[in-house]
């Protein structure tokens, strides 16, 4: 007898089921088989990032869209696909004020893609870069798209100041300017406080001391510094040429924020940044930074047709939510949901990239999930490498993909918290 599943493709389901005369339970199972058979397996076939720039540092002359264009162009080149074969570009970007219409579209066209390529910009705060890749994977899985460039970009150095209520005019008194970095990137819209204050909440509720945070921050810098010296980031980074008024461009190829000289003593001298007598300081928090990263997502079928070996397949993704003031702990639930979806245990996972929104968050989540510290942020995290908020989600995934390959390891999880009390997480497998 012919396989009814094979017959089903291209046939009206209701007509087919009536023809087969099967009962309701069998119908449900049959429909599930038909649907699942049409789901494609999304894979990542290239990944790249710029070096991370300090605030007002080497990349200050580049708008977010210009940084995005650099990685879009390079991701497509590394994937070995034709620009005209790209269906869509999805880029995360948080501080969009003043960038102009649809920053992702700007990155796409300036990145060498033709006018026929669609583009969409995502704002899911610190999770924007990873959410863009999650959306790309969904499009590939459903067959809506075939090849997608996805990632994130941010230039916090170029964030504007905003003059609220200026449109109506000021009759008397002083006008108040708002810093777009703070207002749109780092300020809780619900509790009316800086995200650093939520770090203090975690410190108190989950009993994470200042000493633990400083030790974690020091180790993040040490791991990142060691990774740079060993050339571990070399393959994932695309060099950026910085134009000069005179002479040849300066080649920028190394993450700027990392400090090899970070010590417990130097960290201990810093004052609390968000609360008198608090524990969160500028030293155990990430900086505000500039950078971009992108991956190319396609189906395993298309990768085979292209003759490209995937870096990894996207196995699952998850989101979660909690009360806004506990935003730092939101990845706990996202990772738990992801493990249920994939059927993995934490013992099955080789590497975990957890965005270091603050050192206190990384310490608390590692403890809460009983993570193996030897698997978490093995080359340092945002406390050392920086946190260009729209980029970070795609940055941690990119770094993890290259480290999985270097170790010949198989499974990895990338996760981030994000303002407002949400989190995103993704599982990949080689």
Q: What is the predicted role of each segment?
A:
Residues 124-154, 197, 203-232, 294-301, ...:
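Active-site-proximal alpha-helical scaffold in enzymes
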Residues 147-201:
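Flexible glycine-/small-residue-enriched beta->alpha junction loops
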Residues 93-147, 190-194, 261-287, 368-395, ...:
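Conserved catalytic cysteine-centered active-site region
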Residues 35-62, 74, 177, 263-329, ...:
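Condensing-enzyme catalytic core mediating Claisen C-C bond formation in acyl metabolism
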Residues 198-200, 236, 244, 315-384:
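Active-site pocket-lining segment
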């Amino acid at each position: 007898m012919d396989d009814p599943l094979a017959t089903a493709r291209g046939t009206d389901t209701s007509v087919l089921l009536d023809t087969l005369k099967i009962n309701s339970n069998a119908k449900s199972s049959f429909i599930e088989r038909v649907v699942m058979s049409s789901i494609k397996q999304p894979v990542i076939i290239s990944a790249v990032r710029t070096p991370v720039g300090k605030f007002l540092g080497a990349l200050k002359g580049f708008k977010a869209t210009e940084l995005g264009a650099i990685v879009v162009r390079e991701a497509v080149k590394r994937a070995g696909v034709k620009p005209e074969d790209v269906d869509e570009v999805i880029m995360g970007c948080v501080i969009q004020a003043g960038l102009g219409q649809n920053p992702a579209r700007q990155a796409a066209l300036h990145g060498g893609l033709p006018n026929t390529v669609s583009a969409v910009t995502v704002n899911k705060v610190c999770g924007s870069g990873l959410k863009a890749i999650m959306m790309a994977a969904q499009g590939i899985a459903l067959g809506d798209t075939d090849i997608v460039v996805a990632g994130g970009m941010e230039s916090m150095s170029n964030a504007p100041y905003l003059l609220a209520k200026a449109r109506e005019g000021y009759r008397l008194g002083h006008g108040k300017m708002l810093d777009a970095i703070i207002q749109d990137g780092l300020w809780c819209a619900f509790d009316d406080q800086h995200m650093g204050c939520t770090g203090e909440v975690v410190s108190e509720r989950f009993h994470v001391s200042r000493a633990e945070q400083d030790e974690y921050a020091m180790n993040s810098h040490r791991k990142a510094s060691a990774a740079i010296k060993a050339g571990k980031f070399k393959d994932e980074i695309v060099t950026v040429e910085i134009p000069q008024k005179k002479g040849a461009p300066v080649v920028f190829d190394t993450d700027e924020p990392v400090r090899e000289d970070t010590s417990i003593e130097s960290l201990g001298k810093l004052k609390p940044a968000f609360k008198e007598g608090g524990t969160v300081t500028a030293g155990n928090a990430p900086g505000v930074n500039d950078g971009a990263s992108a991956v190319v997502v396609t189906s395993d079928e298309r990768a085979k047709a292209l003759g490209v070996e995937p870096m990894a397949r996207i196995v699952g993704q998850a989101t979660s939510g909690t009360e806004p003031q506990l935003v730092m702990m939101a990845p706990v639930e996202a990772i738990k949901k992801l493990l249920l979806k994939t059927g993995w245990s934490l013992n099955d996972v080789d590497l975990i990239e957890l965005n270091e929104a603050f050192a206190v968050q990384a310490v608390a989540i590692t403890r809460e999930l009983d993570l193996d510290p030897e698997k978490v942020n093995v080359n340092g995290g945002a406390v050392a490498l920086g946190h260009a908020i729209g980029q970070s989600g795609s940055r941690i995934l990119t770094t993890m993909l290259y480290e999985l390959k270097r170790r010949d390891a198989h499974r990895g999880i990338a996760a981030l918290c994000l303002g407002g009390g949400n989190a995103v997480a993704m599982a990949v497998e080689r």
